[in-house]
Regions:
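Glycine-rich phosphate-binding segment of PLP-dependent enzymes
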Residues: 36, 40, 81-82, 92-118
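A short linear hydrophobic-aromatic micro-motif
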Residues: 74-75, 142, 286, 422-427
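Short Gly/Ser/Thr- and Asp/Glu-enriched loop/turn motifs at secondary-structure junctions
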Residues: 9-10, 79-83, 292-295, 396, ...
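Long amphipathic alpha-helical segments
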Residues: 1-70
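Long amphipathic N-terminal alpha/beta scaffold segment
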Residues: 49-95, 99-102
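Structural motif of enzymes handling amino- and sulfur-group chemistry
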Residues: 305, 313-314, 321-372, 382-383, ...
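Conserved C-terminal alpha-helix-loop-beta "cap" of PLP-dependent enzymes
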Residues: 356, 360-441
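Conserved PLP-enzyme active-site core in the AAT-like
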Residues: 119-336, 451
Length: 457
């Protein structure tokens, strides 16, 4: 019986000659690959005890579905209903319309990436964002590379390579993906000198550690965790005094970084870049796609003498930004010239600054959209996270719409909405399926309502 079924399985060319597949607009390479995979799957089914082969038309439909799935990009848009503004797995910051348009224009056209129009000669790609960064942070000079880990790697390689870097034990963070500050320091060709204890580091610890091989003092903002209780750390002003007294630079990895003060939005403990430099930090680095709300980038700002050395290091070319990212970054930074415009235009700031009343009203509008499609729900107050390793101990008061799953379990509803062509990624909390409105665009309400109704129906 099994042998007869194997003989009856159609050949690859036979299936490719079927009208259902011949008229398809799918790429021939994908079709052939899908035919082979479907036939392999069919053979496995026969070995597993399949009693009869499917009709050829059904087989062709499976092949087309498989080929169409292969054409879907793995990187695609999702609806973020988690309430986590800087969700690392969902791409962190969403670009403003201005930034997205600037990136698209740079991608489509030739540009002045490294061309000096005024003098008709080669220019520098650093010039496109340097003046803006200096204006916004108070730095003497600035540059940008492709992420903050790269920025730290480049800074230490250029300013401390072959020497010793002093850092507090309480600041030796893991920044994600198993990338740890001690390992980055070692990769730069530096020796790490750890001072103090996990919970307490004193001025005298730094002073006692400085020696002939010391090249820099490193401060790391512990943005993705907090040490509380019996603690002590040395303020930036004192660290700068110690470093400068020995002719050394003070370097700070700010992590998320912030151009504007976020305390009015209820986010505390995130120092602004300007505050860091004003305290005496010589070189600071921070991310572009976190609290700044721009594209992925590592921004380096500080004293001109150090920034120029960093620009000339061989690693700088390997870590440089492309034209689309530079265009998006310039557009994002430009919005910060007017704080009100920045909060209104940059999605990250708009989400983080949304008041509880605004979010409640937004949740009511989503609830109505769901009700219009026959989906029952209730409003739930939530504690939203900033995300991206920022303000880890703080929750922002928000609102969510909890969908009644009907005949489905909460997990089944979550899976159905997550496996859509445009996934809806939400939260399950206390056996409720929550659509947290802080991170949902209003223009997605109708799609969410239709998808929920279809899933529950």
């Amino acid at each position: 019986m099994e042998e007869n079924l194997f003989r009856s399985i159609p050949r690859v060319d036979e299936l490719l000659g079927r009208d259902e597949l011949k008229v398809s607009a799918l790429p021939p390479m994908l079709l052939r690959e899908s035919v082979r995979e479907e036939l392999d799957a069919l053979r496995d089914e026969v070995r597993g005890g399949l009693s009869a082969l499917p009709e050829t038309g059904i087989l062709c439909a499976r092949i087309l579905a498989r080929a169409e799935e292969k054409q879907l990009p793995t990187l695609r848009s999702v609806i973020n209903a988690t309430g986590v503004t800087l969700h690392t797995n969902l791409g962190r910051a969403c670009l403003s319309e201005r930034a997205a348009n600037a990136a698209a224009e740079a991608a489509r056209d030739y540009s002045t990436l490294e061309y000096d129009v005024e003098n008709g000669c080669r220019g520098s790609r650093y010039q496109h964002v340097e003046a803006l960064l200096c204006r916004l942070t108070g730095a003497e000079a600035a540059m940008a590379v492709n992420n903050n880990a790269a920025a730290v790697l480049l800074i230490l390689s250029a300013l401390a390579g072959g020497g010793e870097v002093i850092a507090s034990r309480g600041e030796l963070v893991e920044i994600g993906g198993s990338f740890r500050i001690p390992e980055i320091v070692t990769q730069c060709g530096c020796t790490l000198c750890e001072v103090g204890a996990t919970n307490k580091t004193h001025r005298r610890d730094y002073e006692a550690a400085i020696g002939e091989q010391t090249r820099a003092l490193l401060k790391v903002h512990t943005s993705n965790y907090r040490i509380v209780g019996f603690t002590e750390s040395v303020p930036r002003e004192e660290l700068a005094e110690i470093a400068h007294g020995h002719g050394l630079p003070l370097i700070e990895d700010l992590g998320s970084g912030a151009i504007v003060d976020l305390e009015p939005f209820g986010i505390r403990g995130e120092p602004t870049v300007h505050r860091s430099l004003h305290a005496g930090v010589d070189v600071a680095s921070f991310s572009g796609d976190k609290l700044l709300g721009g594209p992925q980038a590592g921004l380096i700002v500080g004293k001109r003498e150090y920034i120029e050395r960093i620009k000339k290091h061989p690693l700088a070319r390997a870590l440089r930004l492309d034209k689309m990212t530079l265009a998006a970054l310039h557009a994002t930074l430009s919005a910060y010239l007017d704080a009100e415009i920045a909060v209104r235009e940059i999605p990250t700031l708009a989400m983080l600054s949304a008041s509880e009343d605004e979010l409640h009203a937004k949740a009511l509008r989503l609830q109505k959209a769901l009700a219009d499609t026959g989906v029952s729900s209730q409003l739930v107050r939530t504690g939203d996270a900033v995300g991206g390793g920022s303000a880890p101990a703080q929750k922002l008061t928000g609102w969510a719409v909890a969908i009644e799953p009907g005949r489905l379990s909460v997990d089944e509803l979550e899976e159905k909405l997550r496996l859509r062509a445009k996934p809806i990624v939400a939260r399950i909390h206390r056996r409720q399926y929550l659509l947290c409105v802080r991170t949902i665009r209003e223009e997605d309400f109708a799609e969410i309502a239709a998808a929920a109704a279809e899933a529950i129906r």
